[in-house]
Amino acid sequence: MAKGPVIVITGTPGTGKSTHAALLANESPVPLRHINVSEWVKERELYEKYDEEWQTYTVDEDRLLDDLEPLVAEGGLILDWHTCEAFPERWADLVVVLRCDHTKLWERLEARGYPLKKIQENNEAEIMQVVLEEARSSYAPEIVVELESENMENLESNVTRIGGWITTWLKNQESS
Ligand SMILES: Nc1ncnc2c1ncn2[C@@H]1O[C@H](COP(=O)(O)OP(=O)(O)O)[C@@H](O)[C@H]1O
């Protein structure tokens, strides 16, 4: 059986990456392992330090990439992270960038208990489409897809659409 693709799901924090990844892992036509990269970094202590001011970890990217490389080689992976430019271009078969209206995003981050400064920073990043630009400058345009993640209907249709893409990808792998 063909191994599964490597799908990067990225977007500003709160856009719905983990929600999409969990549903996709459940509904995918081929088994996919969901790696929440932020959690992975914490669990495996792949960071240099904890930044108190921003309440985030400064990731040790070299160690992170070494750690993920064997999993990527196996395939069948969802990499869920708020940034994507650190990953080697060859890793990704598909890069999904989730987008959300900034007032909705603000509410989601507030509900998460983020400090105001962090909400403002992320909100601004979403308005300026920082993650989308990052994805577009790091990967071939044909593998980058921008999807709206504002409501449950978006969530369901996005996951169905990515599932359809996986089915085609598998067929292409078999015939090549
Ligand atoms: N498409 C969506 N429609 C409605 N709520 C969503 C959607 N995507 C995410 N959410 C909600 O927004 C919050 C943040 O989602 P999450 O998946 O944790 O975001 P991320 O992983 O990008 O930080 C959660 O409460 C989740 O239920």
Region locations from a protein language model:
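Walker A/P-loop
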Residues: 18
